[in-house]
Amino acid sequence: MFQELLATKESKTGTVRFIAIDGRGGSGKSTVAKLLAGELGAEIIQADDFASWENPTDWWPLVIERVFQPITNGASELSYPRSKWWPNHHPEPVVDQPVTPIMILEGVTALRKEFRPYISLGIYVDTPTDTCIRRGIGRDLTNNTGMTKKEIIKLWEKWVLEEDVYTHRDNPKAYADIVVDGTRPLQDQLA
């Protein structure tokens, strides 16, 4: 399904076709991205490498500057600093990533209006907000964040408000070429 649809879409960045996978935090975007990357031989750019709790949705200029513009200018590899989410989070400071004919941008706000000139195919993972919150808190509690459950819940309450503002402003679900149900296995939806 995805290969056939992507074959009908032109690159907007020269030779690379970008797939954007959007949805709420905890919706299942990363799962969809990993499945597609394996199927399509694509590299995944994670919005989480740019976003943070302090700047959950307005990090987009960094992606244009460090991802879309270099690829449009013919870059064969990307290199960009990675943000830090948690007190105990010590990721590799820089991401070095090859550019492939298909690239996937995965994360909350991946279908924002500022990215649309670069996106060949948009996917929205539609999952009820309460399910997303439950999944997100559960994930964050197991990630050695250095934070208490109460602190994580407070961050998620703020996060949902930021997502609501973005969703109302940019309406990513309406822009998506494909909407998948984040509560069902992707393979079941492709049959």
Model-found features: residue ranges?
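Small-molecule kinase domains that catalyze NTP-dependent phosphoryl transfer to phosphate-bearing small molecules
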Residues: 145-191
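ATP-dependent NMP and nucleoside kinases share a basic, alpha-helical "lid"
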Residues: 89-142
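P-loop (Walker A) phosphate-binding loop of NTP-binding proteins
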Residues: 24
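Conserved nucleotide-sensing/catalytic segment adjacent to the nucleotide-binding pocket
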Residues: 43-105
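Extreme N-terminal, non-catalytic leader segments
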Residues: 1-19
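Conserved beta-strand scaffold positions in the cores of enzyme catalytic domains, especially
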Residues: 18, 42-44, 122-124, 177-179
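Conserved lysine of the Walker
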Residues: 29
